[in-house]
Amino acid sequence: MTNASSVVLPRAARSAAASFWMALGVALLLLWLSACAAPLAAPTAGPRTDSDQTDADRRAGVRMELAAGYFARGQFNTALDEIKQALVAKPDLREAINLRALVYAAMGEPQLADESFKRALTLYPLDPDTLHNYGWLLCQQQRWGPADAQFDLALAQASYRAPSRTLLAKGVCEARAGRLVEAERSLSKAFELDPASPAVAINYAEVLYRNQQFERARFYVRRVNAQPEQSNAQSLWLALRIERRLGDRAAVDEMSQLLRRRHPQSPELQAMDSGRFDE
């Protein structure tokens, strides 16, 4: 089986892919944070109202909303301060321990992030959000096997409401590891569950392109580029390379014009102008 070190991508594709993995990481974390900002409460037999919350619930909830906002703005130390206050109110709060791990990861402190995730999993062993986020951290550390195990555990939970998110992360991680057959399978499943997601479509198209399935890759990248609010330099560059492989000169010209007009400072345009299509 092909391993990560033997996968050779064009230089610009490597740059675009690196940027996309980073952007995807932010998107995955922010998706999870939307849950953090919700009122913090344990499941009950009926709807939870404000009157059901304890003072500790409310204090922790306010702190978590503030922490999530600071994290999204890159104010990591301030976010940590708010998380500490949330944990004073509720010492075993799952959302706070998870968010602390995400902040440490963003600060470049993988050991502290790892410790926080392990703490969360000690308290909540089969929590799918924690398993997902820990899997993503392990993927960033190129710990492919353990990352895959966390994703699979998350997907195995019957109560999990976001399987397409984890299938996307799993597929991205498999692609980074050079396991393109497995990545194609995971991303195909993600697309079946969430066909409207541009992140799923563009990653699926990228893997299909790398697997030399150019017609299929064209179909999925066109879905993204057909929506101006979804297309970006990476998706246009991928489309251009696909059309070049398929020999459609008119489509290549169209993509190059769009790339030049919409993203004049992008590394993808620089790669195109330098003729670095297949380095």
Residue ranges and their predicted role:
Residues 30-55:
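Bacterial Sec signal peptide processing site at the extreme N-terminus
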Residues 56-89, 106:
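Alpha-helical segment of the N-proximal tetratricopeptide repeat
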Residues 72, 106-107, 140-141, 176, ...:
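Register position in tetratricopeptide repeats
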Residues 55, 89, 123-124, 157-159, ...:
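Structural marker of alpha-solenoid helical repeat scaffolds
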Residues 96, 130, 164-166, 200, ...:
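TPR alpha-solenoid repeat register
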Residues 42-46, 50-51, 226-279:
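Terminal, low-structured helical/coil segments at or just beyond the last alpha-helical repeat
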